[in-house]
């Protein structure tokens, strides 16, 4: 039976150096005559090559003109819209993959479809030859410069139409050349048919396994792996080229790098599987006949093709064409048409044995074989076509992970379709066991001789019978091999897991050792620093040298670790090589099972890994050297593209200081599930090669992975660059480690452990808390109430006890140490014992001094606390008085009656509560005595503005020396003044006045030095007496101005004494007012009325009413006396304000204390002593007021009016000197 075969190989290449030009080659091999009489028509343009002939039927899809036109429109639209195919990294279309992305432009669709329908019935005879490819490649170079950039809108459509017309004209010229080449090829086919008749099947087997007989040294065609049942077996496209290359003159190629050719021994089991080469040849012929459907994207992980079923008639053409295929050695379809003999001879024969070993090779294996094949990267201008294979498997969706074999159908149908790829080289193996016949009509089939047709029919019948017998044998062998392979793979995975676990444990132990060493070094450095602080003898140079030495040691350790890790990696490589070779032998079924979980392992990772992760999950690989060998230097843009597509490379660590961060990456299962284009074969790796050197499977996987990286980050983390070895050794495929192996858990950490650094921080904080808590207590005294004072007392008491306990413990420790030293060194001399005894006494003395200092500090703190507490209590009482004063005014009449009744009740309860009052009074007396004994603490809040902060010792010495000097000068002046007084001379008054001013200056310095308060008050009282006597002497001499100055000085001294006693007077007044609070409401109105009436009527108050009130002086006298004066000064209103406040505040405690003091009446004797003390202390203010009034009476000095309560000593002394100078 005469049949026609047609092989349409469409090329689409995109060169980055030019403006994305698309060109195509139309190649076909025609022989025999057509039985069906159908014609093959192809519409050749630069954007679409469609082969149509006979009745095109596709089992999953209904072939019709509408479906065909829709597919054509979509392809035309895509190709006309987006030409920059090498840079497309967008999301994949679920039907067309990353290549055929549908774009909606109805104008282009309508115009392009109209042009396609016009040329559908035009017969085209396609053939593959070197001249056609070379001419098309040369024309493609010329057309690159004419390629317009993609435009938008009507102008873009017009330009594209014009460009299409130009290319059509050029293609018509090419068709004429192609027809001439067809005739030459037909003659060659007749010759091969005659040669095949004379050869037997053993010669075919030898030609399949041994190197080719032709001068073209290239790997043998891939052997088919038949499957016995419709079980899951992933499909893969087969590669074949059937024409003898002819070296074109118009194309020049760069010389490829010389490669060594290795021959590997083929296993006897594999030889038995492929003894019958007729099935192999039929699969090769079948793969050439069936083109790829445009609905299937070549950029999917594996290409699924249409199912072409035909009658079970044998092919006579297989025998005629087998020698041609063996001579060409399946140089990836029509590579021989484009490449020279030198290019093809560079492929080592090692790939032949690799292809024979595998029943089904996924895209990853094909990419590895291509890497060690001919160096196609050198030919930047040549392009290759996608391999078209007719498999016995139904069409699956691009997302399907496995495809099943379908039974042979008897209807002879051929689906001839065209696919344009951007990747020039595709190496795909066909595993179809039963190759179905397909009918294709060619107008040139009539030229073949009838003898060749008869021979072909006979041989095809023989093949069909033999193939049926081979199916059963191969299926049994495949089952056995799969079982053995499963067991071997399980053992290998267990070994790899054990090795990885051992490495992890070793690395963890090393990390722990490093941490321990670092801790020890830190301890040493800390000890050195402490010793340096104590001794302060180490020089900075020594420290720097030590630090440098430590750094050098650390560097050496790190370098040693790196070396050890490198050695481990290299040893592991050697272990993995035999495993990799065994994995090459695994059958298609095993790979289909594991295809959904591909895991990749880098051959070498030069990293300083601190905490090891599984190497399968590492993202980076050091592939700098190999990438330089792979990337074509002449094509820089393709080199950049490959760098973009490849994952980021890990920068080598400098000196091993940078440690690899433990990155837990997702395994390849997530990446395979995220890629919608995954088919039965496992995902291939993106190789960093140029567009003219990478295979279509690797490029398809790279494009799909790059497109999916935008949607899922897990795919990018799982994919890795497979490091390529130099050409002489065959490519090794590392075995996949156990899937989804989690990273090792971190070493256990003790949650209760505390580092030394933390210990130091805690010690520092605890040491600071002792001082800071005191400051906090001082700052919170004014805000906290009585409860906070109580808490503070308990806290400070416990702190003091702790301090004493620590001191006693230290003393006991020292004593025990000394006893042990004395006991151990009893033979020592007396000098040593004396020395130890003196040291002990010194320590005890220091300890006692510290204890005394602490006791004094605690006493001062207690006094301050008592004074602050009293101040707070006064503030609270004043607040209560202010609120109760209005209430007392409103209810004065009712209160009078109620108070009379309360007085009777209180008299009955006085005896019961005398003891409690006595205790309180004693406590108050103790507090007053403490306040009086303080140096000058009680006057800090008073009105003595002359008080200064504490001086240093040197300043105190200077001030005290000045005090002594002033006293001596005063004595001398006093002697002179007495001598003048004995002579009744008036100059003595001036002398006495100067002496008194010197006394005032000494009091100023005494306050500066913080002398005891009683000393200052007694000294001021003596000065006041001195000035009063001087004023009397001045009156005796009838010198009124001098007398007035002396009275003013006396008033100044009395007022300053009152200011110093003011705090004590407050306390006594409060105590007396609290005692007599029950009696005050009746007398308060009278006292207020008396004070107001006296101030208004200028009448002196009755002094007899003084003992009835807590303010016995009845301060209304001072305003009356001041107002009675002829010239009231600024000091008198100030005096009135201070005294009236005391008078008004004392009766205001009635409301608060009436309820509490009813049962707490004091003892009359004790109260009388308090009142007497108060009277004595308040005499100073009245003396001062009297002296001021006398000075005004005797002489009114203009401009000499000051507020003595707040005037500094020095200012007053200067003013007095000026006035005395004026008077003199």
From Swiss-Prot:
Keyword vocabulary terms for this entry: Coiled coil
KW Protease (keyword) present: no
Ranges of compositional bias, category Polar residues: 242-255, 341-353
Coiled-coil segments on the chain, per record: 950-991
Annotated source species: Dictyostelium discoideum
Stretches with biased composition (Basic and acidic residues): 260-270, 451-585, 630-646, 755-892, 948-957
Residue stretches of biased makeup (Acidic residues): 49-58
Region (Disordered): 1-67, 111-151, 193-270, 316-416, 430-957, 1078-1167
Biased composition (Low complexity): 10-48, 126-140, 193-212, 228-241, 316-338, 379-413, 430-450, 662-719, 893-933, 1078-1108, 1114-1165
Regions of compositional bias (Pro residues) in chain numbering: 727-750
Protein name: Uncharacterized protein DDB_G0284459
